[in-house]
């Protein structure tokens, strides 16, 4: 992307830049803005005034390191100091005081809250302002409405009814005449008529009664309050009534904010100053004028497109943190007012620091932020599955959350791709399921204008003269409301190759339409083929040959790939792998040049400018998704290094490039039905050679508490009644030793909970002691931390966290090595996913003409119907690259150079590989890309030639070890008495309606009876059946109904319907009238 002489130079921006810019704005601007709003707190009775100053605030360096905050479950935060002034009589005191702690963003663009990495994702909302729409009612008459949206999301509507009367609907309850609203806001009838374009329409509808209501502002306010609050009777005008109206209506529905004021001025051609952020009578009258113009055909009949990005704004991390800071300052204000009152009761002399006491008042700030990070929907646990996930998570944009849409109510139109998303929001990358289209990802070149909250995309500016002279081209960033006025060359993304002469006629985009026009008429052009996609979409090679639905699945599944024990970079890639790995910050980059003194698994010592610098490395650290984060040194001792060089590689990176999977030999053919319906057949080589082996770290913790009797729990090795075998790994303190291999059921931490024995359980000696000496005999209950099912592994770390002598938390970290096995999920980069169905011995796998057995067998029927042909190009080119020892980095949409460019590239490389290796089977002209292969079991060739290749296949985090589950007995639901749902609750297997039909179809009455009664909700029968099974007795046949039937009867009774049920005798089929 870089060119000689910096001509038209463009670079991909840092992928985490959006988060950093947002936090930078919060620290530098937002804090000062909120401190400026903090009011002077006055107490006139005692002549005291307290004030905070925005100028010169300071943030101290965090008192703990990031790693310590994670291990000790603390918040990584910085203390905020602000200048304060206290006037007490004639005494003026100035002090710099601490008002609390603010969470600080780390180098990953995340926050550490109570030891957990969390990230705030960007929210996309409807921008404040006014929006017009027209719709037909049931009689076919056009209804015109204008919706005013406030900065807080409150809505008010202006509408013209069938009788051509203008109404304002300020809440769902009531509509109010526009004249009453304008008068209540401070305008009289004369001013209203002077400021509108259609005074005759305004004068046509008020009758004598309405004119009387708007004679004075007070009467208008009373009328407005009565209709707004739905209050009847005779009201009297008062200050408290005005305050309530101000609080409930004007603050919530009329505050437009900076963005809303700009939008309102633009839409209605007003020139109201930007600092006037509230809705004015002039706005309402201009909005009504426009509405009348639409209704009577004198104005522009244009409905606003609510889904256009020019009508949306981004609420970034800066806006959300600023809101919370304002909320915390509001609480601080109330706390200071209470403290002032308390000071005068005690008759002590106040100082600024005593009013903001560190223990009570200043803790408000950090608790406000911790509550926000813990409960706000857009604050999410940072996804650390692999480096790609870490990079992508901060670039998400979501329509969900407070003030936004919900998954259940959002319309199809709001989920759709919009032309204005082009180059700003990726048309591919979104979640599957109920939130499809509501969460998206920013395109790689997009940036957020933090001042106005719009998403901007870069283009090359081309004027007619510059196009002829081929001079330097300037990159311009266009916001969504600006690019409608430009002719944008759409398909002409040849910025990678300046030398190619532009065509005479090019496809272009103008006002959301696609045209074909002369090159001379083009204003701007796109700068890069990847410009329209997110990071996930940009990592898919040959994406142009895939169906968009499969590309969507691929971009989601790459984020679920598990880092493997031995990573390998892809043979066929897109060129974005290096930037993605770099911006994830999982690798260690040299910040200065120097010479390596020594390296080990924990640190690298670097000598630079006469100083010795220690660079710590991450060593087998658990991620939020239980994957293993580990850094390996990649520089030998004594080597001189330069700034920016890679010193150590993180998980899933090789040579500074992203390496999520493995290049394996695949064949597309059916094999004995084992790859039916997306199942995958694999070779045992993938298991024995640790090709798809990954490491996972599980965390188990236990905490000591004080019992209700006041006795403290104790961590100890001395636990009676337990076998020595279960305690074999404990040290003298009762905690498992480092390096121990532990199995299911082993004790990790021994713990005893004291409890007072009941009198009936006393032994004779204990009763004697109690009678003579009055001593209580205490017993202890064993409450140790045991290793649950599926947790076997090696203990790699044990952490003691002791905040006070009685409150001890012990955390045990266990490393598991997981080979690939039947039931694990694997996927390619084209949405081709499958479950391992069988692991074959390598001698039974199909093999090539040179004797190489294939590693995976995919079903060829998975390609034509899904239309993800990119995997065919990738596997064939991968085979050529493997034989030629080459790696390919291919930009998408190469068909813009010539027809069938991808196919020509693949075939030419296969032909080259065939010549180079002297293997004619690599490229056979009769069926290029395919080859005759042999059955490993018989040695006979298969009837048809088979497509073989090297594909990059990922192992996903959906592993069978965490899915497989069985239950004999377990917990039951309280109401229905049926087994609960889910593996985490030790729940049962659901047999739904369709499963019952299937069993009915085979006539298996007894199995059906067991499933629906004994194994489910027949209370008495399920107890007796357990005993009968254990003792080998006949299973009893019970006549009383199951619990779910009783629940149905009760529900019918609640509807006043009595259901009587009887038993039919089996002998003579007579109704037994005795009610069950």
From Swiss-Prot:
Disulfide bonds: none annotated. The keyword Transport does not apply. Gene3D superfamilies: 2.40.50.100, 2.40.50.150, 3.90.1100.10, DNA-directed RNA polymerase, beta subunit, external 1 domain, DNA-directed RNA polymerase, subunit 2, domain 6, RNA polymerase alpha subunit dimerisation domain, RNA polymerase Rpb2, domain 2. It catalyses: RNA(n) + a ribonucleoside 5'-triphosphate = RNA(n+1) + diphosphate. One of its GO terms (molecular function) is ribonucleoside binding. Keywords: Chloroplast, DNA-directed RNA polymerase, Nucleotidyltransferase, Plastid, Transcription, Transferase. The keyword Metal-binding does not apply. It is found in: Plastid, Chloroplast. InterPro entries: DNA-dir_RNA_pol_bsu_ext_1_sf, DNA-dir_RNA_pol_su2, DNA-dir_RNAP_su2_dom, DNA-dir_RNAP_su2_hyb_sf, RNA_pol_bsu_bac, RNA_pol_bsu_CS, RNA_pol_Rpb2_2, RNA_pol_Rpb2_2_sf. Its EC number is 2.7.7.6. In plastids the minimal PEP RNA polymerase catalytic core is composed of four subunits: alpha, beta, beta', and beta''. When a (nuclear-encoded) sigma factor is associated with the core the holoenzyme is formed, which can initiate transcription. This is DNA-directed RNA polymerase subunit beta. It comes from Hordeum vulgare. The gene is rpoB.
